[in-house]
């Protein structure tokens, strides 16, 4: 009888196992940052696994055969062998990796299933410009914002842990058939598990689906003169290997996916129209260090009517420690393509910024109309620390954003004048220079706005809001007005293009020639104020592009305390940068600050000395001419020539008693040599 019971027990046990179903393991996918680590607990990985019978599941076996770093932490619970997987991507690794795991039924260990834990290591979506005294983070989605750690990415002076800009991004808006379209991002997207689709990297395409698309385009390309010079000097040798970034340079798009064929600019050594660094071709860039990015507006925030525009950006810096202006400036070139089939009229482009100058609780925003600049400064004399955020103390700086070249004005067949009448401006370029249809707007509008609260001065939430802010209106469609908080409810009456010009509009351009009080200073009643400067309007036709050049200029006075001390420093640096831009980047560093290394031998730079400087009516030019004579010209801050003469000896006295006091620039043309020097008459 006992033997019979034993046999029956075995039969019933086998029958139960036969009726029990095996667990189901489901593949997992996770996205991580470039060179990052992940820590995944067993229950997280098994979260989508299940047992049809409701039994408890446990890890049984985990195996990995890749090249990255993987480790397992064991658990003390008897039925589970592993509690956590640690994965760390090796330097330079991008793309797919995988870990195999087996789960088992705790009640019936012979029942199990196998699945894969896929890990997608994203491209390095950001990199730093760090050649001068600013360390600036450039991400494919956003400028100067560390969207991995949620902190400021614009450190200045470099290495001191203090920053002035939390984030910045271009905004575009226009009308088509009286419907408003816009493309605007603020802080960009984050690479979090399964959130890669919120990244905006890559050209306008038919399809943005798939990890391979994001692997190729969710990145930036950092190039340097060192790599460029190496390539130029060695590309023709057998077995030469170009720098990896040269091989990856996004010169061409995939036309089968609807992308434009020609994308990032390059020097075509053999003029065949095809980028190939093994033929000597190389990226074309500005500065001695540059970061290039391409983004689309397929994914964007709060803008359902997207414009189908493609933005190419090049941020760059120069290595010139002896020039304080160059040493404290980051440049940005934007080329924006209309890849749609729509013609947008009344189009504006702006630069939005969240400016956290040290401690952001006491920041003030204002603008300098004549210098085509908006800026942030401290509201009181001391910029205190705020928790982990380091303030600038008793020497708070100024951080400016300058429109060196705004949007091109629509062609009208005339040379529009420098002035305040319609189709004229006082802070653009090409106005009144005798050349037809070469005019570019300067900064046409500026406003700070609140992060929250007001229904008319708060953060934009739809296409109409973005268009209004870019074109000089509040969210309730009322024009900016001079005085108060810039809204008609604040007491102002006269329409204006600019809020808080702080006495900088010498021609009263912003108010259409109406004379208004000389000073209207910034206010920080907006809370954590953010600001937008814009340029336009212009017509944006299909397949056309618009080009802008911006400069982020930092100024600080290390000898004088107080919140006003840094203003003249920033203004002087802006003046220098604007002059350099108008004169092919001639700098005190010696000759031209090159936009890219030329494939030829450079000319040895001559030495130029001017004294006294500052001066009253006369100054002396000490310069050894290479030719029998050299041509000297003096320009004011607007690029207008105010004096000229020839240099025929090693020392030449120049009399400029007939010009007013101020900052000027001396340009000497000596054969192929062109030298530049800033002077101050007082």
Model-assigned labels for residue ranges:
Residues 86, 100-104, 665-669:
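Extracellular recognition modules
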């Amino acid at each position: 009888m006992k033997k019979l019971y034993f046999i029956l027990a075995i039969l019933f046990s086998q029958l139960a196992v036969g009726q029990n179903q095996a667990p189901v393991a489901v593949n997992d996918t996770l996205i991580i940052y470039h060179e990052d680590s992940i820590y995944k607990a067993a229950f997280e990985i098994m979260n989508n696994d299940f047992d049809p019978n409701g039994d408890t599941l446990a890890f049984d076996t985990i195996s990995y055969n890749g090249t990255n770093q993987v480790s397992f932490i064991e658990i003390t619970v008897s039925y589970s062998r592993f509690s956590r997987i640690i994965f760390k991507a090796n330097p330079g690794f991008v793309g797919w990796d995988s870990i195999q795991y087996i789960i088992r039924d705790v009640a019936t260990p012979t029942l199990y299933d196998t699945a894969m834990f896929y890990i997608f290591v994203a491209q390095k979506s950001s990199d730093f410009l760090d050649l001068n005294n600013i360390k600036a983070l450039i991400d494919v989605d956003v400028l100067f914002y560390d969207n991995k750690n949620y902190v400021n990415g614009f450190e200045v002076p470099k290495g001191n842990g203090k920053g002035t800009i939390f984030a910045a991004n271009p905004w575009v808006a226009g009308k088509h058939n009286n419907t408003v379209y816009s493309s605007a991002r603020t802080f960009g997207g984050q690479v979090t598990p399964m959130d890669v689709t919120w990244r905006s990297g890559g050209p306008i395409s038919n399809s943005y689906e798939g990890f391979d698309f994001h692997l190729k385009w969710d990145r930036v390309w950092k190039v340097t003169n060192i790599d460029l010079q190496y390539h130029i000097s060695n590309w023709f040798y057998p077995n030469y290997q170009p720098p990896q970034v040269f091989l990856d340079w996004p010169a061409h798009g995939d036309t089968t996916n609807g992308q434009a064929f020609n994308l990032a600019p390059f020097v075509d050594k053999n003029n065949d129209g095809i980028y190939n660094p093994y033929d000597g071709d190389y990226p074309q860039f500005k500065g001695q260090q540059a970061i290039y990015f391409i983004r689309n507006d397929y994914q964007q925030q709060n803008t359902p009517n997207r414009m189908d525009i493609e933005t190419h950006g090049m941020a760059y810096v120069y290595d010139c420690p002896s020039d304080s202006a160059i040493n404290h400036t980051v440049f940005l070139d934007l080329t924006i393509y209309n890849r749609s089939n729509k013609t947008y009229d009344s189009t504006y482009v702006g630069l939005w910024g969240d400016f956290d100058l040290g401690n952001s609780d006491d920041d003030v925003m204002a603008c300098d109309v004549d210098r085509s600049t908006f800026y942030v400064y401290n509201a009181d004399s001391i910029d205190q620390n705020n928790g982990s955020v380091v303030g600038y103390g008793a020497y708070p700086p100024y951080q400016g954003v300058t429109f060196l070249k705004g949007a091109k004005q629509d062609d009208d067949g005339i040379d529009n004048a420098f002035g305040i009448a319609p189709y004229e401006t006082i802070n653009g370029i090409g106005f009144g220079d005798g050349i037809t249809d070469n005019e570019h707007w300067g900064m046409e509008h500026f406003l700070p706005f609140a992060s929250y609260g007001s229904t008319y001065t708060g953060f934009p939430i739809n296409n109409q809001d973005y268009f209004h802010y870019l074109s000089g209106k509040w969210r309730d469609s009322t024009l900016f007005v001079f005085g108060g908080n810039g809204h008609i409810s604040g007491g102002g009456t006269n329409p204006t293009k600019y809020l808080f010009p702080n006495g900088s509009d010498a021609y009263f351009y912003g108010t259409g020639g109406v004379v208004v009080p000389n000073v209207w200073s910034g206010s920080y009643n907006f809370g954590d104020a953010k600001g937008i400067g814009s340029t336009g309007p212009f017509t944006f036709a299909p397949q056309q592009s618009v080009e802008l050049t911006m400069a982020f200029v930092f100024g600080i006075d290390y000898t004088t305390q107080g919140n006003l001390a840094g203003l003249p420093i920033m203004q002087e640096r802006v003046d220098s940068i604007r002059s350099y831009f108008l004169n092919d980047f001639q700098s005190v560093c010696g000759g031209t600050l090159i936009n890219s290394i030329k494939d030829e031998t450079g000319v040895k730079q001559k030495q130029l000395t001017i004294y006294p400087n500052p001066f009253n009516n006369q100054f002396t030019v000490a310069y050894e001419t290479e030719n029998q004579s050299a041509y000297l010209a003096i320009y004011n801050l607007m690029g207008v020539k105010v004096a000229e003469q020839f240099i025929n000896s090693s020392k030449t006295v120049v009399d400029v008693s007939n010009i007013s006091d101020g900052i000027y620039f001396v340009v000497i043309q000596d054969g192929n040599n062109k030298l530049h020097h800033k002077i101050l008459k007082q």
